[in-house]
């Protein structure tokens, strides 16, 4: 009966609310977010002294609040990550994982510092972040891939190794250049007047080691450093000759010549001798023949050249008596024809007969 009555009241909309019914008014989500933001600012930015009244003022500017609410979860995530890494580094960190943990901890600290600056700018009102800006782009500025850091560290190690090797090579090269070298001996003459009144000019020349004494006699008045002409032809070292001015006649300008070291004459190279073509030797071989070599020319020796130079410069010897060195032509040697060894001996080998073998036995 009560059920039918309730149904009629429901259809006729006559049902009244029960006196025991309790209704709860839910708060909007904005108030919850503002309280969470207030707790976050009180925890991390106490020095800013942001009050709830300030947050209500900020709530009028929806852009500032929205940006702060976007940064809030990211800031807490980086904060918890940094705290975990610091605890891991302080207690029980493995040696091979310490470099990676230190890098990640530094990255988290750098991101937290950047977020602190952003929050401060947003609260003060001197910074505005547009909706198009992405937080991922912001994180890319302060984060680096671990593989890239490892590659950079490896390259830096190679650069340091190359610097060490280069420094070692430079030091070794400098030590080699500073090593004492044996300088050539120097013969220096002193200018002055001898006891007999002879004027001597000051000369200096490079003296080559291991040279023989000069072949010029001292009676001629011509002196030369200790050096032989044979060594001059092979080694290009300058020499200066000293002479007595009294040997020259006064008024004879033709004989006044400057005595200088004789320049080495070019040596005439002999034509190469063709190799001997040997014929095959045998029983019926032909006689060996050698081709005639070119005529050999001999140059005057150093002693002869030096004597001729002295005779030219000496006033006591007439110039007509001095003969220039001539090339002496030596005829090629006459090589006789040579036959085989049997023909030279004049004995022919005979085969032993049977009768000779029996008689010898």
Curated annotation (Swiss-Prot):
Q: Give the keywords, sorted.
A: Host cytoplasm, Host Golgi apparatus, Lipoprotein, Palmitate, Phosphoprotein, Virion, Virion tegument
What InterPro entries does the record point to?
A: Herpes_U44
Which cellular components does GO assign to this protein?
host cell Golgi apparatus; viral tegument
Q: Where in the cell is it found?
A: Virion tegument; Host cytoplasm; Host Golgi apparatus
Does the keyword Lipoprotein feature in the UniProt annotation?
A: yes
- Lipidation (S-palmitoyl cysteine) occurs at 8
The task this protein performs is described as:
Plays several roles during the time course of infection, including egress of virus particles from the perinuclear space and secondary envelopment of cytoplasmic capsids that bud into specific trans-Golgi network (TGN)-derived membranes.
Family statement: Belongs to the herpesviridae UL51 family.
| Protein name, as recorded | Tegument protein UL51 homolog
Organism placement in taxonomy = Viruses, Duplodnaviria, Heunggongvirae, Peploviricota, Herviviricetes
Name of the coding gene: UL71
């Amino acid at each position: 009966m009560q059920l039918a009555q309730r149904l009629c009241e429901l259809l006729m909309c006559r049902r009244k609310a029960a006196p025991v019914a309790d209704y709860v008014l839910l708060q909007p989500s904005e108030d919850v977010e503002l309280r969470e933001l207030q707790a976050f600012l009180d925890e991390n930015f106490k020095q800013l002294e942001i009050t709830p009244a300030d947050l209500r003022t900020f709530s009028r500017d929806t852009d500032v609040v929205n940006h702060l609410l976007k940064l809030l979860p990211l800031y807490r995530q980086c904060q918890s990550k940094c705290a975990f890494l610091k605890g891991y580094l302080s207690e029980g960190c493995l040696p091979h994982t310490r470099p990676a943990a230190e890098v990640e901890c530094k990255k988290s600290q750098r991101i937290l510092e950047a977020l602190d600056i952003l929050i401060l700018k947003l609260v003060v009102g001197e910074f505005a972040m547009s909706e198009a800006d992405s937080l991922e782009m912001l994180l890319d500025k302060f984060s680096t891939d671990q593989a890239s850091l490892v590659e950079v560290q490896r390259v830096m190690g190679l650069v340091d190794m190359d610097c060490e090797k280069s420094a070692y090579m430079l030091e070794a090269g400098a030590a080699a250049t500073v090593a004492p070298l044996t300088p050539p001996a120097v013969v220096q003459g002193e200018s002055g007047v001898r006891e007999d009144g002879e004027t001597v000019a000051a000369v200096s020349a490079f003296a080559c080691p291991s040279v023989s004494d000069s072949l010029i006699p001292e009676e001629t008045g011509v002196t030369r450093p200790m050096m032989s002409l044979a060594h001059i032809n092979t080694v290009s070292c300058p020499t200066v000759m000293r002479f007595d001015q009294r040997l020259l006649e006064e008024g004879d300008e033709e004989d006044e010549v400057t005595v200088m070291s004789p320049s080495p004459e070019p040596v005439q190279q002999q034509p190469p001798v063709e190799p001997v073509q040997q014929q095959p030797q045998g029983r019926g071989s032909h006689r060996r023949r050698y081709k005639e070599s070119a005529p050999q020319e001999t140059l005057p020796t150093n002693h002869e050249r030096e004597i001729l130079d002295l005779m030219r410069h000496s006033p006591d010897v007439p110039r007509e008596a001095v003969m220039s060195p001539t090339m002496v032509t030596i005829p090629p040697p006459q090589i006789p024809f040579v036959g085989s060894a049997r023909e030279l001996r004049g004995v022919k080998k005979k085969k032993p007969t049977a009768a000779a073998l029996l008689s010898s036995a």
